[in-house]
Amino acid sequence: VVTIDHVFNNRMAILSDNVNGLQALVRCAYANGHRRIAFIHGERTAVTENRLAGFYKTCAELGLEIPDAYVREGVYHDADRCAEETKFLLSLPQRPTCIIFPDDFSALGGYNAIAEAGLSIPEDISVMGYDGIYLSRVVKPELVTYQQDTTMLGRTAADKLIQMVEHPRITLAEQVLVTGKLLTGRSVKHI
């Protein structure tokens, strides 16, 4: 058995490098002058735990103290839930200057909540996504996002499965990390 983005004991797992993904997003926000960075993450899974670790680790390395209120639990691919979390963040006395969403689709909920509040992206608040789906390239303003390399995830999983079938006695269960890349857009303002 080969799994993608799920870890099971004694099973081959091909994983998107979620720690590196959040590090890239936080560093991009920081390089653009943001110090009040919020993160709406997905429900608690191994993927989420890695993303949270990447977020907190990078913030600590950069000397950023992130208030607990800036880290919110949303639901992956649920734009409405992420819109509600965005409204909460916007209601804070000292709101964040940048919000990282759990995925690009959920960021649409953030776009809507920000517009409903009479604010503009990126003039009033910056927004980042995760996944790098086609939608992130066509939404206005174009979303800054971390693109997972889904082609390499699939190819690596297929290669490992073939290896397991052809050489079952010498194939060891391992975890293989596949890195993605930061896609620039126009949703983050330099402050």
Model feature map: region roles:
Residues 1-191:
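Bacterial carbohydrate/catabolite-sensing allosteric modules
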